[in-house]
Amino acid sequence: NRLPNNGVIQVGAQLRMPLSWLAVKQAQAKLTAISGDVQIQDLKGAWRQAQAGEAVQTGQQIKVGINSSARVQFADASELVMQPQSSVLMDTLSVYAGGYMADTQLRLQGGRVEVHANPQGRQGQKFEIITPAAVASVRGTQFVVDAQNGRSLQQTLEGQVALQTTQGHVLVQEGFGSAVKLGEKPIAPEVIKPAPVFQSPASRFVDFPMAFKWVAQTEVKGWVMQVGRDAQMAQLVLTHQADSPFFDAGGLADGRYYLRAWTLDDKGMPSKTVLHPFEVDIPRKLQGAVIQLAPHYVSMGSMTIDLVPLPPGQRYLVQVTRDAEGRQPVWYQANAGVVLSLPQLPAQDHPYHLWIWIY
């Protein structure tokens, strides 16, 4: 501490000491919200469906499936929102000084996560996300990390983040992003591109389709759209990626939602996001029981449905969901005819469900 006299400490002097001198104890994280297929691995290596509200310990891993999400809260009130098809290992969860200082280190095995770190602004907090290609050390509060195929992307939404590899490091300031490939040094930070602009988005739907459009951008190579029940997308309903600025939100149940969208450039760097709240209010009546689809019909894409003709003024809505509760729609057809062929759907480890509505 460079004291002029080691035997005298003046009133008001600030001293630095190693964390190893402080009492340390294991901390726990908490799954505060889950939506869809969220799995947690116990310390013996077995996987099971996660439950909202359960504690997560050092050494445990969480993975999130298609059209699913999870929110994790840590000892210093930091929050991590896991996006679809992401996987995170709790590498270190510790607290010092009676819980005032936290040391949180996470391993992002793959996928996209969004972080709001140290929201209380306490000094001495440590929050790191380790990817296969780099380490993101937080010196700010809000940032995004995405790890795919040996490449990591990082964007700082508020504060600053140090992105480091064995080959070098960069300091990514607020409003900038960087990328790094395995075994290389991070690229110089680039300004995050502006969010896409909606074209007169509807705030309430009383009929199909639930369509949204954005202003076309020639330099954009892709569009990502998400629908969730909250603005953070911790209660995600669906995600869609396309090469055009158009999105049909599908056969959503009645209720309030948020639509979030961003663009991707030719290097895969995401833009800022745009958020739009909307409501669905389309009266409908379930026709018969919900049908559990046999896996071989789904994988072959050869299932045909014959429907009874309806009286004038009534229409069919046919819908397929990933879950039995109808919260995760993957396909729908409004104003369906009396003969309908279902498309081929991606394989999953539990049955799809078919819903037939009259509206």
Task: Enumerate the language-model features and the residues they cover.
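Extracellular fibronectin type III
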Residues: 184-185, 266-280
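Flexible, surface-exposed loop/linker segments and immediately adjacent secondary-structure boundaries
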Residues: 14, 22-161, 166-177, 182-202, ...
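Extracellular LysM carbohydrate-binding repeats and other cell-envelope/extracellular binding modules
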Residues: 2-26
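Conserved aromatic anchor
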Residues: 208-220, 301-313
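Surface-exposed, short loops/turns at beta-strand junctions within beta-sandwich domains
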Residues: 249-258, 343-351
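Short beta-strand segments within Ig-like beta-sandwich modules, predominantly Fibronectin type-III
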Residues: 236-243, 330-337
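Flexible, low-complexity linkers/stalks enriched in Thr/Pro that connect modular domains
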Residues: 181, 190, 276-288
